[in-house]
Amino acid sequence: MEYNTSQLCDIYQDQVDVVEPMFSTFGGRSSFGGLVTTIKCFEANGIIRQIVKESGVGRVLLIDGGGSLRRALIDADIAAIAADNGWEGIICYGSVREVDALADLEIGIQALASIPVGADEDDTGDSELPVNFGGVTFLPEDHIYADTTGVILSPEPLDIE
């Protein structure tokens, strides 16, 4: 499904939070949206690898990586697992790597930057908790919508018809 965050903001301006502009698009899908699943981890992606093995149909993985630009939390392998399991997209407050491979995958991916250094593979981190960055608090079960213009958050699903 295609999402236009500008139109959604025009229609639902009093109902959405707008995330501060900071993300670049890396995945093969330029717009995506769904129910938020949160992860908080720092320079380690084992917990991410575990979560993307779950069914992601209708879900967006939102990762608070502490804004780290030193190690990539998302690589082609993790993103491919997520795409294979139906995840709509990944928003990473952190870095990605293997950018050319990410662009070939049928999943939306937004992150702060790319770097060739991979993250540690330990399972350090937590999931399904409130996280805060970009001037917004993200709660599990919120609904998030992203495109090349920006990222918006709503406590309820938005009617895009």
Curated annotation (Swiss-Prot):
Family matches, as InterPro entries:
RraA, RraA/RraA-like, RraA/RraA-like_sf, RraA_gpbac
What's a BP term from Gene Ontology annotated to this protein?
regulation of RNA metabolic process
Q: Which Gene3D superfamilies match?
A: Ribonuclease E inhibitor RraA/RraA-like
* Record's keyword terms, sorted: Cytoplasm
- Return the GO cellular component terms, semicolon-separated: cytoplasm
The protein's location, in the record's own words, is: Cytoplasm
One annotated GO molecular function is:
enzyme binding
Physiological role: Globally modulates RNA abundance by binding to RNase E (Rne) and regulating its endonucleolytic activity. Can modulate Rne action in a substrate-dependent manner by altering the composition of the degradosome. Modulates RNA-binding and helicase activities of the degradosome.
Instruction: Please state which protein family the record places this protein in.
Output: Belongs to the RraA family.
Q: How does it assemble?
A: Homotrimer. Binds to both RNA-binding sites in the C-terminal region of Rne and to RhlB.
> What name has this protein been given in UniProt?
Regulator of ribonuclease activity A
Q: Which organism is it from?
A: Tolumonas auensis (strain DSM 9187 / NBRC 110442 / TA 4)
